[in-house]
């Protein structure tokens, strides 16, 4: 009985372990595509799938009729077994646009093209604590909670940037196009956006975040923080477009659509979690937010009196889509996950440093806020960058460190979910009602080997009992 048990269980364990390893070693979409094209069966299915996608916009004959639909469905199912299906991209990578083009061609085919879902970017899983260790201008909050500097932290951050060669180089690179006026225009908005993306992609977070998320005690500081991205050029326009129309425009651009999906994924609020973030990771949320800067969906602080942010849009002329529009806009304005992440960076705290419980479990692999997107005609194929068809509150770390160092003080700089009003100020409550949906399946198999070991132990106990 014992040998029979080993005979059946060990091969299964080996299979699961190998699957776990391969799932964690996920290829980027450029490499996965190259790998697929070298394999005849995969290449054939991939080309078929691309024809199916193209057919949605050009009425290609392959997409008409039941036989064609079956062929498209067969190609989809076959590619689910390939590394191309689970490929991801890295923000700022050398071939990012090409990688995202491949990802969305697969994603639109396998999941549909009407909703933003999972992020196309490989998870970074960084921690704010990694940034704090290298930030020279943030006060030692843990040791001197009562004695926070009365100076301008945003000004200090700008000075620190000028002392760093990389930060100074890329900051100057965006200041010039964002402040140089053109004929009949305030600036060259396209060049300004591109330079801003490079700044947040290339400059270490200790400097870029220091300027964008600096903690403030007065209007002079908050206004400097709001002016970080030169909003007169990168953010403001003569008129505010409807937010759903702006989202439609964003969706036709590989970079913008990807950064927006990343923001939905990593800044998803969850009131039951320790941090008010579903992902329980402030650093990933701040990275996703900063990734939107330099796209048509560029967000910024609404005013100098709160942490509320929003893209340059409103919900006028929404008609029957007013509810969807407000839901989209409020995901930015009333996002307690993002607000707590900004607070945490300014305070020098990090929920993941003391997290006493695992993230909230949901019934889906990844829960994101999904918004209806109207189908729009796509630009000409080949155009660059265009898509053709718990237990403790967020302040607990500060409190714990205060007790450890025996320093008295207030933790009023860190607010909980109920402290935020619609304008981001203390004293009112806000709640964001969102819809959820499942994302593409991931390769998370880490619990399976444990289950197999448990089953093996049980079978061994039974076999030993029988032999005795």
From Swiss-Prot:
One annotated Gene Ontology cellular component of this protein: neuronal cell body
Signal peptide limits: 1-24
GO terms assigned for molecular function: glial cell-derived neurotrophic factor receptor activity; integrin binding; neurotrophin receptor activity; signaling receptor activity
Disulfide partners: 36-42, 154-214, 161-167, 178-192, 187-233, 216-221, 243-313, 250-256, 267-285, 277-337, 315-325
Key word Glycoprotein present: yes
Residues covalently joined to lipid (GPI-anchor amidated serine): 430
Subunit structure: Interacts with GDNF ligand and RET: forms a 2:2:2 ternary complex composed of GDNF ligand, GFRA1 and RET receptor. Interacts with SORL1, either alone or in complex with GDNF. Interaction between SORL1 and GFRA1 leads to GFRA1 internalization, but not degradation.
Protein name: GDNF family receptor alpha-1
Organism: Mus musculus (Mouse)
């Amino acid at each position: 009985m014992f040998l029979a048990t080993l005979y059946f269980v060990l091969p299964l364990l080996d299979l699961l372990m190998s699957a776990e390893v391969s799932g964690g070693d996920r290829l980027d979409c450029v490499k996965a595509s190259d790998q697929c094209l070298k394999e005849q069966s995969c290449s054939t299915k991939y080309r078929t799938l691309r024809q199916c996608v193209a057919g949605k916009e050009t009425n290609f004959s392959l997409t008409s009729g039941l036989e064609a639909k079956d062929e498209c469905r067969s190609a989809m199912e076959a590619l689910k077994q390939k590394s191309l299906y689970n490929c991801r991209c890295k923000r700022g990578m050398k071939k990012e646009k090409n990688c995202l083009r491949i990802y969305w061609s697969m994603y639109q085919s396998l999941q549909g093209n009407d909703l933003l879902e999972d992020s196309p970017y490989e998870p970074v899983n960084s921690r704010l604590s990694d940034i704090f260790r290298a930030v020279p201008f943030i006060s030692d909050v843990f040791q001197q909670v009562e004695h926070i500097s009365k100076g301008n932290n945003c000004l200090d951050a700008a000075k620190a940037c000028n002392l760093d060669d990389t930060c100074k180089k890329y900051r100057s690179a965006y200041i010039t196009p964002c402040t140089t006026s053109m004929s009949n225009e305030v600036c060259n908005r396209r060049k300004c956006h591109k330079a801003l993306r490079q700044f947040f992609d290339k400059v270490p977070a200790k400097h870029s975040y220091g300027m964008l998320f600096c903690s403030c005690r007065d209007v002079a500081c908050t206004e400097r923080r709001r002016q970080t991205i030169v909003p007169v050029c990168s953010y403001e326009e003569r008129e505010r477009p409807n937010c759903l129309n702006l989202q439609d425009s964003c969706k036709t651009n590989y970079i913008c659509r990807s950064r927006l999906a990343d923001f939905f994924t990593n800044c998803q609020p969850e009131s039951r979690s320790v941090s008010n973030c579903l992902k329980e990771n402030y650093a990933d949320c701040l990275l996703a937010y900063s990734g939107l800067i330099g796209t048509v969906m560029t967000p910024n602080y609404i005013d100098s009196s709160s942490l509320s942010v929003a893209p340059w849009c409103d919900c006028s002329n929404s008609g029957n889509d007013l509810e969807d529009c407000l839901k989209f806009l409020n995901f930015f304005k009333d996002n307690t996950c993002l607000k707590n992440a900004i607070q945490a960076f300014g305070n020098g705290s990090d929920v993941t440093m003391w997290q006493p419980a695992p993230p909230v479990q949901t019934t889906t692999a990844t829960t994101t806020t999904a918004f209806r997107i109207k189908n729009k005609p796509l630009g000409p194929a080949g155009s660059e960058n265009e898509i053709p068809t718990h237990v403790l509150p967020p302040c607990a770390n500060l409190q714990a460190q205060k007790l450890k160092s025996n320093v008295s003080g207030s933790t009023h700089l860190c607010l909980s979910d109920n402290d935020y009003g619609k304008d981001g100020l203390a004293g009112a409550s806000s709640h964001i009602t969102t819809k959820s949906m499942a994302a593409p399946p991931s390769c998370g198999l880490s619990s399976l080997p444990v289950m197999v070991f448990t089953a093996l132990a049980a079978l061994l106990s039974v076999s030993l009992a029988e032999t005795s």
